[in-house]
Amino acid sequence: TFHKYKGEVCTGFQLHPVPGEQYHALAHNLKIIRFVADNCPGFIFPDGVYERGNDKSAIELLLGDKLLIDYVKGSSDWETVKEHIKVEEQKWIRKAKKFMLYEEQLYRCK
């Protein structure tokens, strides 16, 4: 049935990570979006305001970070973004640590 939707516009995707395996959802999704943007000639990021009461586009609201937006649009490289994510994750982990219920370490970009 993989030809069932041939020729139709894709409006989303689902990921099914392997249970028990460490998985970095942000990194994976950024790479998927970048791959699609680089390899699908008809792919565009919609222009204009995404929702009423906010002056940002959909991609700006979803990613919320200029460097991540630059990456998915092709004007930044993965190594730069990966280092940026590491720094931002460390800040978040320090803030979140006091609220954690378990000793398990949070998974980080490596």
Regions found by a protein language model. Give the residues of each.
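Conserved functional hotspot residues or short segments at active or partner-binding sites
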Residues: 1-83
